[in-house]
Amino acid sequence: MALSIMSSYASFRPFKPSSSLSSSQNIIRNFDENSKYHIRSNGDLTPQKDLDKYRDVLRKADPFDEGLKMIDAIQRLGIDYIFEEEIDKIIQSQSAYKFFREFEHDHHHHQDLYDVALRFRLLRQHGHFVPADIFNKYKDNNKGCFDTRLREDIKGLLSLYEASHLCIEGENILDEAALFSAQHLEASMTRLHRYDQYQAKYVATTLQNPTHKSLSKFTAKDLFGVYPSENGYINLFQQLAKVEFNRVQSLHRMEIDKVTRWWRDIGLAKELTFARDQPVKWYIWSMACLTDPILSKQRVALTKSISFIYVIDDIFDMYSSLDELILFTQAVSSWEYSAIEKLPDSMKTCFKALDNMINESSHTIYQKRGWSPLHSLRKTWASLCEAFLVEAKWFASRHVPKAKEYLENGVVSSGVHVVLVHIFVLLDETSLTQKTLDFVENMPSIITSTASILRLWDDFGSAKDENQEGHDGSYVECYMKELGGSVEDAREEMMEKISDAWKCLNKECILRNPAFPPPFLKASLNLARLVPLMYNYDHNQRLPHLEEHIKSLL
């Protein structure tokens, strides 16, 4: 392999200035000299003409160089919703087919690994399929593996590692890329620590939180200030990101106030004293899934549905007899008020509040569309309760199902199906029709893959919320009884399945079904991205990382 294929960053100092970085520094300098962008005390953006200057910089950027780096910076800072039109034009100017053909026929091997991997990642993220074969030219033909000389190119390895997380099933070369890049980045840490703690921290952070599987909502604040990233444009857009962070933070606080008042007003916290009372935590799911500030009403409405998933889960896990759970499930399947007459008052209250919430969501769509999603929403909630009931019967009879059977039911009992169906309805995109809703209702792979990620992460440590009692099954328990393996064997199998589920989810988001609008795809990805934070319990059954993020955001 010719040496010219490697990045010009052939040293263990990964962010050595280059012509590309100098270009970004010149743009930043020119922007600062011509703009008086600042933050008002109330957090508003001022003036509008300065926001237009940001857009103008993006419009004038070379789409094959600075434009892509700017998009990367904007996405990392979590302000891509401001520049949707400009980003779309830059991405559309790229041709995945042309990109591949040009690379395939280039016999000089001069492409920089960082640039190629960045372009590959951004095109795939925006629904343009680029074959993973483009990375074959970075392999040693004699050995059949990635050229070990690339280990010197820390910047390129970081970009390759980021790109590898958009792998779909059967792309062995991206599996190899992930292993190769991670191995050599980890090996570089000792040398990096000697002369630049910031750069070492950046590599460690990337290894732990690759962009595609992270939420910029939680990571963007770490980029504020002088950040030693490979992308100099982060410093250009961070002032705007700070303004937006403050503005959106105020919006989130207002939404939490609405959610907590609604939760108090419906009285379930007093009626169901055994159930979790965590409206802020429930809101975090909505905040993470629906990131565009304009979706304020949708976040509040989604949090209401999520609260019932938690409450009903606690009813099935901790409170009721099996006979009562059967009656409750029958009531949710028929939606007849006569079916709840024999239930305790607390379960009657829950049923009525759930029915009111579903009717409210359906009526909103009916007013806009002239048809109601009521039947679909009710059917989805009935499926959830039926899955909860299956688990309750397993526990009552001391039956431990086969691992496959447990996971198939667990995909439904995870509640992901309910959340994503509600999101699909709440987004109210032009693609929302009874036909597309029927399709989403019937558990397409974008839902089952996301649900598998949540169910397996939830079971990985078999932890519960602080102070929560009750009984739950676990994939670990089912696997060990069926196959006789150890806890470590079960967890290794679970991580493999999580990896496979991510590949399936990636495929759905890259090879896009017209039935799924981009905001729905993004919400599905964001749900999967939040899962590790929501289930990363410590030995005290607390979520310290999530609590830290909540404090910084709210």
UniProtKB/Swiss-Prot annotation:
Tissue expression? Highly expressed in glandular trichomes.
Chain residues that bind Mg(2+) 1: 313, 317
Provide the residue positions that the database annotates as binding Mg(2+) 3.
458, 462, 466
GO molecular function annotations of the record:
magnesium ion binding; terpene synthase activity
Q: What family name appears in the similarity comment?
A: Belongs to the terpene synthase family. Tpsb subfamily.
Q: What information about domains appears in the record's comments?
A: The Asp-Asp-Xaa-Xaa-Asp/Glu (DDXXD/E) motif is important for the catalytic activity, presumably through binding to Mg(2+).
* Function of the protein: Involved in sesquiterpene olefins biosynthesis, constituants of cannabinoids and terpenoids-rich resins. Catalyzes primarily the conversion of (2E)-farnesyl diphosphate to (E)-nerolidol, and the conversion of (2E)-geranyl diphosphate to (+)linalool and (-)linalool.
Identify this protein by name: (E)-nerolidol synthase TPS18VF
User: Which species does the entry assign this protein to?
Assistant: Cannabis sativa
The gene that this protein is the product of is: TPS19BL
